[in-house]
Regions:
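Intrinsic disorder/low-complexity segments
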Residues: 2-19
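Long, charge-dense accessory insertions within large macromolecular proteins
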Residues: 10, 20-82, 87
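Conserved mixed alpha/beta core segments that line enzyme active sites in large multi-domain catalysts
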Residues: 44, 49-52, 71, 75-78, ...
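A generic structural signal for short, non-catalytic loop/turn and secondary-structure boundary residues
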Residues: 58, 97-98, 132
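Structured core elements
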Residues: 62-65, 104, 124-126, 135-138
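Mobile "lid/hinge" segments at catalytic clefts and subdomain interfaces of large enzymes
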Residues: 128-159
Length: 159
């Protein structure tokens, strides 16, 4: 089996049949291009709608698509990522999630360092197909001021 053959096989999760499928390389490239395009659109939307100069100008944010088991499918940078969805899955069952749910947290400890400090806000939205969660779209961004002793949420006098 060559490297090209490996790229031509996709193993589906047991919940979706657990079968191995042969994937046409052209179809694979179309899917890859669609995922990249989706990530680029997420980036543009994040920058365009941001109120925080850290997001808008410094580009201190992350966008990505995860599967239902918290594995990265596609993202715009690789320095962040693992740990963004796992805290949500530990707190909420997939079966209890509903269309329209948005999950939000900013705790760097529960996400195993995927975000670095409390000003990084993570938002995750489950994606549904036929009533089942199949993926998550995830963003995080650095917000300048989330409250605290001093403007900017960072005070040298805090203990």
């Amino acid at each position: 089996m060559t490297a090209d053959d490996v790229l031509s096989y996709v193993v589906c999760e047991p919940a979706f049949g657990g079968m191995v499928m042969v994937v046409n390389p052209v179809v694979l490239e179309i899917i890859r291009g669609s995922l990249r395009s989706t990530i680029q659109e997420m980036e543009l939307l994040m920058e365009r709608c941001a109120m925080s100069p850290f997001i808008k100008e410094k580009k201190d944010y992350f966008v990505g698509i995860y599967d239902r088991r918290s594995r990265i499918v596609c993202c715009h940078i690789s320095s962040s990522g693992p740990g963004m969805v796992s805290p949500i899955l530990e707190a909420y069952a997939l079966e209890d999630m509903c269309p329209g749910d948005v999950y939000w947290f900013n705790d760097p400890y529960i996400c195993k360092g995927a975000v670095q400090h409390h000003q990084d806000m993570v938002f995750a939205i489950p994606v549904f197909d036929a009533g089942k969660v199949v993926a998550f779209t995830v963003t995080y961004g650095h917000y300048q001021d989330i409250g605290g002793m001093k403007a900017g949420s960072i005070s040298p006098h805090a203990s």
